[in-house]
Every structure is written in C-alpha cells, then in structure tokens.
Amino acid sequence: MSRSRSSAKAVQFKHESEEEEEDEEEQLPSRRMHSYGDAAAIGSGVPAFLAKLWRLVDDADTNRLICWTKDGQSFVIQNQAQFAKELLPLNYKHNNMASFIRQLNMYGFHKITSIDNGGLRFDRDEIEFSHPFFKRNSPFLLDQIKRKISNNKNGDDKGVLKPEAMSKILTDVKVMRGRQDNLDSRFSAMKQENEVLWREIASLRQKHAKQQQIVNKLIQFLITIVQPSRNMSGVKRHVQLMINNTPEIDRARTTSETESESGGGPVIHELREELLDEVMNPSPAGYTAASHYDQESVSPPAVERPRSNMSISSHNVDYSNQSVEDLLLQGNGTAGGNILVGGAASPMAQSVSQSPAQHDVYTVTEAPDSHVQEVPNSPPYYEEQNVLTTPMVREQEQQKRQQLKENNKLRRQAGDVILDAGDILVDSSSPKAQRTSIQHSTQPDVMVQPMIIKSEPENSSGLMDLMTPANDLYSVNFISEDMPTDIFEDALLPDGVEEAAKLDQQQKFGQSTVSSGKFASNFDVPTNSTLLDANQASTSKAAAKAQASEEEGMAVAKYSGAENGNNRDTNNSQLLRMASVDELHGHLESMQDELETLKDLLRGDGVAIDQNMLMGLFNDSDLMDNYGLSFPNDSISSEKKAPSGSELISYQPMYDLSDILDTDDGNNDQEASRRQMQTQSSVLNTPRHEL
C-alpha cells in the first residue's frame, strides 16, 4: 500500500509539472484563441488551464460530462471516470482526475457539497466546483483569477533577511552578553561575601559558647563558695554505710580477735538463740540485771561516726575504762569459772566480783542490734543533709549547742557536789558516764541481752617480771592526768552534735566496764558492801581530783613504726614520748593561730580560691588516720578477710568551705576555750597493748 501511494504521488507530481509547462506554453496561443463570439470575451492574460476549462464547460457537445448549473455560478462534472478518460487527454495531455482537481484548488475553485448533489447520495458520481469570477456568460472575469504561490517560493522569500535587521540582532546580542558578564561578576562577589559572613558567624558562635561556659563555671564557683549547702557539696553525712574490707573497720574488728588469739586476755562468747532460755533465768548470786530508760529525756537518734582506732569500738558492746574496784562488792565471790554479768543503763551498775587472784571480772553491756523504737513524744530529728542551711537555722543550732553545753556543765557541777559530800575515792573515770547522771529515778527497767564472759587466767611469763612500774603499760599509773581524752577524737565535728550522740548512746545502751590484769595488775577489792554509783565515778573533775596525787610528770605516749627492744616483737609499735604536755598545748595553739591567719587571708579581696585544692588539703584519709598512730595489729588484720556484708563504716565527705570561712569569731573562741578545758581536765583511755 505504501509503495502504491508513493508511486501515485510521483505520477501526480509529474502530471502537475507537465500541466504547468503546458500552461506556460499555451498562454500565447490561448490569447489568440477565439471561437465564434467568445474570442473577444476572453482576455489575453488568462492562463491556458482556465481558457480550456471555460471552453469545455461552455461547449454544448460536452454537457453530458461537464456543464453549467442552472444558475450559471458553478459547473458540474457528472461522470468523473468517463470525463477523465475521454476529455482530459484531449485538453490537458493526461487522464488523472486528482491532478485536475488539484489544479482547480490552486486557482481558487472550491468543491460544493449539498444535500441534493451527493451529500446523501453516494451512488451519483457528480462533483461541483465554483469560483466567484468563473461564471456563465462572463468570460472577461477570467483575468482576475490568479494562481496561488507555491510554498517553496514563499519560504525562499522569507528566508532572505535584510542586513539592517541582522546588524540590529547582533548589537542586541552583544548588549545581552555584557549584561550577563556583569551579573556573573556580581554573583561571584556575592558568593565570596556570603562565605566570609558564614565564617564570621561560625567563629562568633564558638566564642559565644566558650564565654557562656566560662560564665556558667564562674557562677557555679561563686555559688559553691557563698552558699555551699545549696548544691549539697558541704553537707556532712553521719550515716554509716555498708562497705567491706576498710582499714579502719578491720582494725577495730580484729582488736578483740588478736587479743583472744594471743592467749593472755579474756575470751568473750556471745550466746546463740537456743541458749538464751538457759541464761535468762540464772541464780541470784550469779546474775543481776537492772536497766532504766527515760523515754521523755531521750535525745533524737544519732549515729556517732568513728574518729580513730582508739575511739572505734563495737556498736553492740561498750567497753569503758572504769576500774572494777569501783563497782565490785567487797567479800562477794563466786565459785564458778565463767561469770555471767548483766549490763545496766542506770547509774547504779550492778556486778558480781570474784577473787582477782583466780579470775578476771568484766562488766559488759550488749547493746541491741537496732535502735529502740522512736518515742512518739520525742522531738523529730533532722540530719544535716536534709536541713536547709539558712541564717535562722544556724542561729537555732547555735542556741541548741549553747543550751546543751550549759546542761552538761550543770551535770558536772552536780557530780562534783555529790563527790565532795560523800568523799568518794575514784581511781579512773570515763567522760562518757558523766552524761547519764540524775536519770535513774524515772527510767523503766529494760532487759538487756546478756552475754557470757569467759574468764581465763593470764599466762605469766618471764617478760612480765622484767617490767617496772615506770615502764609498765598495763599499770593504771601509766595514765597521765594531763592527757586529754579527745586526743584521738575529731575536733572538726560540731561539739553539740557529738555530745548529743554520745549522751543518746549512753542512755540507750548503758554503761559497761571492762578491766583486766593487763590494765591493772594489782588491785584490792573494796570491803564495803554497798555499790558505788557509776555517775559519781564518771565526772572528769572528780577523776582529776582523785588522780591529783598521781605523778604529774607523766609523758604522753604514742605508737609509731617498729621497735627493736627485747620485751616486744619486731611487729609491735615503738613507744615514743613527747617532752611534756605543754608542748602539745603549744602545738594546738600554733595550729589555731595558723587557722585564724588562713581565715583572714581567705576573707581578703582578690584571693583566687580553688575549691578542689582546698578540699584536697582536708582529705579524710590523712586527718582520720589515727593522728599518725599505728598499731601492731595492723599487719595481722590486713591479712584476714572479713565476711562480706557484716561491716559498718561511716561515710565521711569532703570538708566544706563554710567551715573554713566561718565569720563567727566568738563561737570559735568559745570552742577553743572549751577544748583547752577538756584537755586539762580529761583522762586518756588506756592505750591498747598486745603481747
């Protein structure tokens, strides 16, 4: 189909070209062609195609194939096939009907379609054409019919441009290029400026972040200096934590173990639960218990943190320094080897005596594992870490401490009056017992958990005979009356809190006494049948009066390093002595002066304070390490492993700047004077000693 169409088009183009050539050739003959009267009517400029068409339509002989319509405005070709076969070869040298119709369209003829003329009749082979200037009896109008110009010629005419237009276009292009170059340069400059601005913004942001960090650090530092309690950095905690295998607890825990393993000291065994029924109902001569507890006078429960190895003791058993002869009845003895003693919290401590030549007697009070239930009427207790530190709260705490000091002073005065009235002779006293006076009258009886004390005779050896009264550490005379009891205590703690905690423990857990031949080798049991009051023998002033006749030139003893003597092992500590107690007092005064100078320096302006540096100066491990004291059982206790989960240690936080920058100079003077008074009027506990 495509090939047939292409061939048909080629034939059509060939006929058209031939027709055009014929038209050009026949223009001149057609001008001279005149038939009868129509020759004068057709003009000289009429194309041959139009002249031939006019002759065919107007000829009556060809009406059967082509003729005018009734109105004479158009002509009709009735039989196209026969017309193409018979008439076209005679006039146009071809028999292609399509080429003839195309020529008519080129000269402006239009096909007329109507309802009557084949619009709805497909069986009729007729076709009608019309032109405004092709009419019957009007041949003179043929000159106005013009052939349409071909597309190729129009394209050639339009493709030719004038030089003026071309030059104008070139100038416009040059202007546009200049503008584009200008815009490109501006865009590049803007990009560079934008990059510079972004870099400056990044640098400024970094500087701003650094400045903000510096300001925040300065604000936090100032807040910690001015108000350290707000961020809980300066709060002292007195609550004990469960920590395993700490050096301080190992020392305190293994003290009794080393003494018992040495073979020369008493062995204390705690009863199990299945043996309590046998112990709760002993014979009257072997067991006596009395305990009084005043619920209304109970101070709030507080936990006393240990200060040194000398002050760390078991919280379940309280060992006092009070001598046995103050509490034993004269002439009252037992025949058994094991003595069961019930402790009492009242001042009238009851005990059972035995001949010191056969066995050692101890008065022991075992405290319960947990505190007694809090009395509903007792005042609430607030720890320092839960109390907001404000000037009003500080003032109230200062008032409470002053009131507590006055009460203690009144108790000491009352004890002195009783001692002066009764002429009681006291050999040794404990400062803990002075806080439990005048309370036994209203205290109800409380049964304390008993303990079995197994008394074993000491193994005498030749080394004991070499000791003289001057160098015997076991003798009572070794204790100096000028030695302070708080030499191993932490002086940085508030005195009011310390005294309240000790008083509370004395009221709850009672007074107990432990003495042995180690501490008093020879003593006489009093012959009086009455018991001595523990409070009367516990005041510091009474102890000072009773020991006024002792030697005043005693030196202060300290343990350090190792000793190469013959009487002790190489692992034991060396006994060093200071020249006099006055040197200790002078050292304390110099340290106090240095602290005052440091306070004045810190109060001055322009002093850069590093909080971490100041806190590092007050490391607990340095301050609380027994003040330079070491003991022979340290190496032994370090090798032993404590059972997991059975130790208690106090949590000691870093010291606060508020303790150093305290502006209350009057309170500091009072505390310094009180410490000096206690130093002069107190008696040091018997130092530990091991074989």
Curated annotation (Swiss-Prot):
Q: Where is the composition biased (Acidic residues)?
A: 18-27, 659-668
Q: Where in the sequence is Phosphothreonine found? A: T258
Pfam families named in the record: HSF_DNA-bind, Vert_HS_TF
Database matches in SMART domains:
HSF
Q: Which UniProt keywords apply?
A: Activator, DNA-binding, Nucleus, Phosphoprotein, Stress response, Transcription, Transcription regulation
Which SUPFAM superfamilies does the record cross-reference, listed alphabetically? Answer: Winged helix' DNA-binding domain (SSF46785)
Q: Name a single GO cellular component.
A: polytene chromosome
Single GO biological process annotation from the record: negative regulation of DNA-templated transcription
Q: What PROSITE patterns does the annotation carry? A: HSF_DOMAIN (PS00434)
This protein's record includes keyword Disulfide bond: no
Q: Name one GO molecular function term.
A: sequence-specific DNA binding
**Which compartments is it annotated to reside in?**
Nucleus
- Signal peptide (UniProt feature, chain positions): none
Primary subcellular site in the record, as a coarse category: nucleus
Question: Sites of the modification Phosphoserine?
Answer: S256, S260, S283, S299, S580
Residue span of region Disordered: 1-31, 288-307, 658-691
Q: Known post-translational modifications? A: Exhibits temperature-dependent phosphorylation.
Which residue stretches does the UniProt record annotate as biased composition, category Polar residues?
675-685
- Specify the DNA-binding region ranges: 46-150
Q: What does this protein do?
A: DNA-binding protein that specifically binds heat shock promoter elements (HSE) and activates transcription. In higher eukaryotes, HSF is unable to bind to the HSE unless the cells are heat shocked.
Q: Which family does it belong to?
A: Belongs to the HSF family.
- Assembly information from the UniProt record: Homotrimer.
Q: What is this protein called?
A: Heat shock factor protein
> What lineage is on file?
Eukaryota, Metazoa, Ecdysozoa, Arthropoda, Hexapoda
